[in-house]
Regions:
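Short loop/turn and low-complexity linker motifs enriched in small/turn-promoting residues
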Residues: 16-158
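N-terminal hydrophobic targeting signals that begin at the initiator methionine
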Residues: 1-2, 18
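Sec-dependent N-terminal signal peptides
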Residues: 3-14
Length: 158
């Protein structure tokens, strides 16, 4: 009787597999399922058990992405993802005294800095001697450089 139960459990666990296809733009992204690398996108015909799973996507030049998926008991699940590109954004100040703050999280005082930012809108605040100098939304949609300097009127000017 024990052998029959074990065999029945094995058959049920094998039968409860779902075929997973993972499509990613851009192609060639590394696909990691529950901490295990399962290939480069597109991944076709990978067997998974129903339940919750974590998919992580990685590719140079793109922001890594993690997604939680709930796999239902079905024959096939096709998961489509689009990764967000990264852009090189440079910030430069022509004089000392500037403090930069990005998204309320990252702060620096360097006169030159190069950041890789995920595509999209980012809030940039610039302070000069601890006074707000500039507050704007920077859209990362290409590689670009921002140069900051204070306006100083010439002596004797009106």
């Amino acid at each position: 009787m024990k052998q029959i139960l074990i065999l029945q459990f094995f058959v049920v666990s094998v039968m409860a597999q779902v075929t997973l296809d993972v499509k990613v733009l851009p192609k060639g992204a590394t696909v990691i399922l529950d901490g295990k690398e399962i290939g480069s996108a597109p991944v076709k015909g990978y067997s998974v058990k129903p339940g919750g799973h974590e998919i992580r996507l990685e590719k140079n030049g793109y922001a890594p992405a993690t997604h939680e998926i709930a796999v239902q008991d079905a024959k096939r699940l096709v998961a489509d993802f689009i990764m967000n590109p990264m852009y090189t954004i440079k910030f430069r100040s022509k004089e000392k005294g500037f403090t930069f703050e990005l998204n309320g999280e990252h702060t620096w005082r360097d006169e030159k800095i190069k950041l890789n930012l995920e595509a999209g809108a980012h809030r940039l605040r610039v302070y000069y001697l601890d006074e707000l100098f500039d507050d704007q939304v920077v859209v990362a949609d290409r590689n670009v450089e921002f140069i900051y300097t204070r306006y100083q009127p010439e002596p004797g000017g009106n």
